[in-house]
């Protein structure tokens, strides 16, 4: 159940107090992890390679850059991606909130303004006063 999952996560977070967590990569997973951990009092070191070298698909130094498509797929609850969004919403997913804030019209899917999406993520992570260090 959701209640049991939240309790399990709280117990795991308690084990990380007074420790530092290193996260490699400021893509979607790295940013969500960094944000979640810092909101729960864990110090995070977030390492991103773009300052040194970008891949051919990467165009900016922003975090959470969507390189292939601006679509985060269906919002229909009977689809796998739609159901996942409902679950992420219940778990208070940082990136889902940002995505909804940056949404552009696209029918029954969640599509975002890619630049706005990445700028908000980058600003939230870099300006987080809860112990996130970007390198």
Task: Spell out what each predicted region is.
Residues 1-10:
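N-terminal amphipathic/basic-hydrophobic helices that include classical n-h-c signal peptides
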